């Protein structure tokens, strides 16, 4: 069998085991042809391969490239000053009353042109790529006007053109009510003006909504879902982060790819997600940064068979995090997730949360050849250590990056 590239003398985490584990192969080989894996498994069982190029991995570990399935990467401005104010005793209400909070990010993002937004976002993207990310989702949501939401999504597309990475764009116009606006009037605008325009331009694959008492109601979220489906877009939701608004249950009824945050998720929501195959995207960075105490119902989600994905939730207000490795450690420490769950959460299950499980997140024939090659002794090192980046190489579609 001819192939373009062969990686050998490697230990593999295929994430393709029947038991849902890491699918470890001790002496493994990965072969790639035209950007797709043609073989991944034990070297002893490999077909006769005739590669154009070979890489001796010297017993390093190979996993699927990491996938960050929930980010707000494209924004302008800096809210470190608010962090400092909170440490000195200011409340979120105090900061918001002084013009801070999400309004500050909206103001800065609206004021920035494409070039400024791109310059601000590239370092955040580069930090993620430096830890093995090959695919990430990027949400809009800091424009809150049609032109500014389009600007964010346009910059997300530009990032993918400038770096070797796959970007999955999500429209999050229903992130917050614009300053001085009315929630229902703005929801109507999202549904009748923004979603049709963004769908027509092919700028987003999915629509997200923040369903919470301080954002959009259950009924308004459903209105957004109906509009999204009418325009052929996938559905996602920020749900049950601060209270139980039954948003995850609603999203599951509409076949949502994922429900994210879900600290206050109840049993009815879990059952609905399990029945619909909706992925639970857990965001330990936001939990940590906001000093939350309501842990997502991990054991109940496990018992129901709901897939568990992880993401950084990179954003300026509640999770200024660009490290998937640190997010894994947070998930293990704060949520008591296992090593296998943490690694699967940034590979196999993250691919599922983005509707890409047919080609990303596992090492098996037919999948895209997106790899992360690690200088580690065991998979647990990726989760156990903090402030440690053992990435040896990143591969996208069979090409070293």
Swiss-Prot record:
Fe(3+) binds at residues 70, 72, 238, 313. Zn(2+) binds at residues 70, 72, 238, 313. Binds 1 zinc or iron ion per subunit. Its EC number is 3.5.2.7. InterPro entries: Amidohydro_3, HutI, Metal-dep_hydrolase_composite, Metal_Hydrolase. N-formimidoyl-L-glutamate binds at residues 142, 315, 317. It is an enzyme of class 3 (hydrolase). It is found in: Cytoplasm. This is Imidazolonepropionase. The lineage of its organism: Bacteria, Pseudomonadati, Pseudomonadota, Gammaproteobacteria, Lysobacterales.
């Amino acid at each position: 069998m001819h192939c373009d590239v062969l990686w050998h003398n490697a230990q593999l985490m295929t994430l393709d085991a029947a038991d849902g584990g890491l699918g470890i192969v001790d002496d493994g080989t990965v072969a790639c042809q035209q950007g797709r894996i043609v073989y991944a498994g034990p070297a002893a069982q490999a077909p006769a391969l005739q590669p154009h190029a070979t890489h001796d991995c010297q017993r390093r570990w190979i996993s699927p490239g990491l996938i960050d399935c929930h980010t707000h990467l494209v924004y302008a401005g800096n809210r470190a000053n608010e962090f400092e104010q909170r440490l000195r005793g200011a409340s979120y209400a105090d900061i918001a009353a002084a013009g801070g909070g999400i309004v500050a990010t909206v103001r800065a993002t609206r004021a920035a042109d494409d070039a400024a937004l791109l310059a601000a976002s590239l370092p955040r993207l580069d930090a993620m790529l430096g830890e093995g990310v090959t695919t990430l989702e990027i949400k809009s949501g800091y424009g809150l006007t049609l032109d500014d939401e389009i600007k964010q999504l346009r910059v997300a597309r530009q990032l993918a053109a400038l770096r070797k990475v796959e970007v999955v764009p999500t429209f999050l116009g229903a992130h917050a009510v614009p300053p001085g606006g009315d929630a229902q009037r703005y929801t109507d605008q999202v549904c009748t003006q923004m979603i049709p325009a963004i769908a027509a331009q092919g700028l987003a694959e999915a629509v997200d909504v923040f369903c919470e008492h301080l954002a959009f109601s259950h009924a308004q979220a459903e209105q957004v879902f109906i509009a999204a489906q009418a325009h052929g877009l996938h559905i996602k939701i920020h749900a049950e982060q601060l209270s139980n608004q039954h948003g995850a249950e609603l999203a599951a009824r509409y076949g949502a790819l994922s429900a994210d945050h879900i600290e206050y998720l109840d049993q009815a929501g879990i059952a609905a997600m399990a029945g619909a195959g909706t992925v639970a995207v857990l965001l330990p960075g936001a939990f940590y940064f906001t000093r939350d105490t309501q842990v997502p119902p991990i054991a109940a989600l496990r018992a129901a068979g709901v897939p568990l994905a992880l993401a950084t939730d990179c954003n300026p207000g509640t999770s200024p995090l660009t490290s998937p490795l640190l997010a894994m450690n947070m998930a293990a420490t704060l949520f008591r997730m296992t090593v296998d769950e943490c690694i699967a959460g940034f590979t196999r299950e993250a691919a599922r949360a983005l509707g890409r499980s047919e080609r990303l997140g596992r090492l098996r024939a037919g999948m895209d050849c997106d790899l992360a090659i690690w200088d580690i002794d065991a998979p647990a090192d990726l989760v156990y250590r903090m402030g440690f980046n053992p990435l040896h190489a990143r591969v996208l579609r069979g090409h070293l990056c």
